[in-house]
Design a protein with these regions (language model features):
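N-terminal, positively charged nucleic-acid-binding surface of large information/translation enzymes
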Residues: 1-110
Length: 110
């Protein structure tokens, strides 16, 4: 979890989760803790930006996709849906869900 605060606002992020498998209780714990902190700062009148998301590159993902008989993008799209559904079920108040396969993300990091 990263916390950055200044007079303009408060920025907080979860780890960018690696999506070689479905979300588990550890992901939920970290995201819920981050959400609680974001909500506390909002209640106190701060302009909060809460980021979460997924890291969708790497050999583990390629192997997991292959084991399921899918290409990597199809596989991560399905897993990301599970993350988003879980955060919705937990009423997580994130402002932006970043994916490392998003064009905007790839443009920035190149």
């Amino acid at each position: 979890m990263i916390l950055i605060t200044d007079k303009k606002g408060f920025y907080i992020t979860t780890p960018i989760y690696y999506v070689n498998d479905k979300p588990h209780i550890g992901h939920a714990y970290t995201t819920l803790a981050t959400d609680i902190i974001a909500r506390w700062h909002r209640i106190n009148g701060e302009n909060v930006f809460f980021l979460t998301g997924t890291d969708e590159h790497g050999e583990k993902i390629a192997k997991a996709a292959l084991a399921k008989g899918k290409n990597s993008q199809e596989f991560v799209d399905e897993i990301v849906k599970e993350y988003k559904d879980a955060w919705n079920d937990l009423n997580i108040s994130y402002d932006y869900f970043i994916r490392t396969t998003d064009k905007a993300h790839m443009d920035v990091v190149q």
